[in-house]
Amino acid sequence: MRYFRNQDICVRLEGDSIKGANSFSFDSSYSSPKVEVVGKGILTRSYGGKNESVGSISALILDDGSDLYSKFIANSGVISNGSLGSSDVNFNFNQGYINSYTLNGGVSTLPSDSIEFVAYGEIENEEIDPQDNIGEKAFKSKSEHIQSFNYSISTSWKPSYIMGTHLPVNVSRVEGYTISLDLDLIVAGSAMDSVMNDFEKLISGSNDLTIT
């Protein structure tokens, strides 16, 4: 199953809504659970996989005060469930993980996002009603002091697979993430703490990060 769309869509990951910005692709590597048999006779082993689909979306987060970023950090990019919607099609999946997440911004502009993720498990396709009802709210940060910034999270999390029947062993699972931040900041020394706290809250949902 391959699906591409060039219009606004709605994405919901762990309860947070993201509205697409004219760019979305969704490609399923196979439509049913994949099983590979290795060996012969009593040495035969079954390798059971899951449905896997790769999706990418260029998006703008519209929910004011969203803690989507901190969820990605806390869960190493793991998505417990989610749905991808547009004007007439909806995709649901059980689990997935974030490959990478990038947030860009500048003076007098709302931040823009880029998210790439892999969904797996029960992936379904169904007709739905239009769901374009997210209200836009501006971020309440002192962006006039921030010239530009680029914030990204990349994860190496992979789904688990089971090998064997009597004594199953989990294989092909790697967890971890990398965070990077490029920031061009112009602010007087007396206002540094206030501006940095606002920016930290913007990118993480809290102001307890340390940016040096």
Describe each region flagged by the PLM.
Residues 1-212:
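Signature of extracytoplasmic/envelope-associated structural regions
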